[in-house]
Amino acid sequence: MKVAVLGAAGGIGQALALLLKTQLPAGSKLSLYDIAPVTPGVAVDLSHIPTAVEVKGFAGEDPTPALEGADVVLISAGVARKPGMDRSDLFNINAGIVRNLVEKCAATCPKALIGIITNPVNTTVAIAAEVLKAAGVYDKNRLFGVTTLDVIRSETFVAEAKGLNVADVKVNVIGGHSGVTILPLLSQIEGVSFSDEEVAALTTRIQNAGTEVVEAKAGGGSATLSMGQAACRFGLSLVRGLQGEANVVECAYVDGGSEHADFFAQPVLLGKNGIEQVLAYGEVSEFEANARDAMLDTLKADITLGVDFVK
């Protein structure tokens, strides 16, 4: 099993690479790429960690050597948020980066499962899809927007608020991956009840958690460590699905035939071909239904921005 991380010298990429080096199945290969010349050194650094995962690093303009034979590609390349920026401000820089990298994936590893981490995910996933379509290799079951950070934040914040063991808390998060498009389905959490005020406050905190980190770091970065953990969880789930493990389910932003938008985050069953089945997200509360309906114009506009960028 070969996993490639594109953007591996960045804050998310290095955290993700460290976690994958320590957690990928024995015998896996981990391939790191970044434009930054430090990248082969990141691989050497990681190679000193005693796990049976082979690491190689590649720098420069062309990611092709890193992508050859990849089963899973995780793309975190791009610029990070700074105070005062929202995820859409990132679009102007990151859109071109994602387009160029996905073009290389289409040429080098067209059957790989691709997880897009680079923000704004609502838009960059649509860009990736259009690039893959133009290359004639698009398979909607092999492209994912990684929204796992919203899930782990939801699980953490709910556990803290209710005094629960976080390992026992499971939260589905639907919609998209920025602001109001992030919708945690708090009404579905078993054995927990929330007041209307708690639901509103928790939902808002989850939606704005990225800003919480950006402001707390005071211009020194964004949510790199928690995003690295979230991306590792999702990447390992992709690997487990590819290896034939049963009942591997994660939420992800996918082209899943949603009635709501061309791309929509919801639970998916993972398997040997990527998405085996898009799962229904179930009954929602009135608050959640209203929030879902209210986000759709924003989500659709984000998607259109990506489609138009490629065309």
UniProtKB/Swiss-Prot annotation:
GO terms for biological process: malate metabolic process; tricarboxylic acid cycle. Substrate binds at R81, R87, N119, R153. It is an enzyme of class 1 (oxidoreductase). The active site is at H177 (proton acceptor). This is Malate dehydrogenase. Coiled coil: none annotated. Catalyzes the reversible oxidation of malate to oxaloacetate.
